[in-house]
């Protein structure tokens, strides 16, 4: 999820749908993030375009489903903020192939 939606997604405090209070709660919880879960309502995502917003929503929903399933058999291990930062850094080069020369140099130490 970190590569798509960022390291954290907050849940906004509940408020009645269509109210200014709900909008304020959503904005507060979403500050600095790409998505927010609205308690008892659903999810909002912000992105540069609609396709990216849908990708964020799909990723958050998928991770939420995994979390609920994991909770059904015990307490899942949650990653610390430090570990999440480490993962974010690793994702910057995730899937990129190293050159043979670089691999050889790294193997030699």
Question: Where are the regions a protein language model picked out?
Answer:
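Glycine-rich flexible loops
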Residues: 1-109
């Amino acid at each position: 999820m970190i590569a798509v939606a960022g390291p954290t997604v907050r849940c906004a405090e509940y408020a009645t749908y269509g109210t200014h209070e709900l909008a304020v709660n959503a904005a507060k919880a979403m500050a600095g993030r790409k998505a927010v879960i609205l308690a008892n309502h659903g999810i909002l995502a912000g992105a540069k375009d609609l396709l990216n917003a849908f990708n964020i929503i799909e990723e958050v929903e998928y991770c939420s489903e995994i979390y609920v399933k994991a909770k059904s058999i015990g307490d899942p291990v949650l990653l610390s903020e430090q570990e999440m930062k480490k993962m974010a850094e690793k994702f910057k080069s995730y899937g990129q192939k190293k050159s043979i020369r670089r691999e050889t140099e790294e193997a030699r130490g």
